[in-house]
Amino acid sequence: VEDCETDIMVFGADNVGGIAGYQGTATAEHTSIVRNCTSRESVTGYGYNTGGISGSITSYGDSFIENCQAYGDVSSSLHQVGGIVGYIVSKGETAVDGCIAYGNCRGQHSVGGICGYAKCNDAACIVDIVNSIYAGREVEATGNNGSNGYTLATGLVGWLQVGTGKAHIVNCASRVQTVKTVGK
């Protein structure tokens, strides 16, 4: 998906995004890219994985979000909420590069100004969050997750879980004014 813009409020259950609800590849030989796209309105999920650009990236190959902007607030009544992407689980390389999120982010847990939750447990996995900015006012987590009881909210990546893969957060900034949590 390249050079597109949405100017509508988006509502949905799981995997809700301003440009793509679900982004990914079924095999290692394929690549998915969202590039030079803008989402101008709010994105609201009533389930898991809500993002200003992509709700979820689940990929066996490589997936990229490049040079995108999300202007609206991003919220969900459940988990994994991000200003750009709600949820990343990858067996290949996944990158968020050169993106800006301007809206407030709110969810139950794993809430981040750029990415809500990123998991990189496969040896071939690489997750890069680079050259990106969260310029919203507020990130809020209203509950906790069942596995460890933590609320997990931050201006960049709410929960970054790395096993045998590699993850990098490089040259990013958060201009968040308030991070609110309820719980641990």
Segments the model singles out, each with a brief description of its role:
Residues V1-K184:
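Predominantly extracellular beta-rich ligand-binding scaffolds that present long acidic/polar faces
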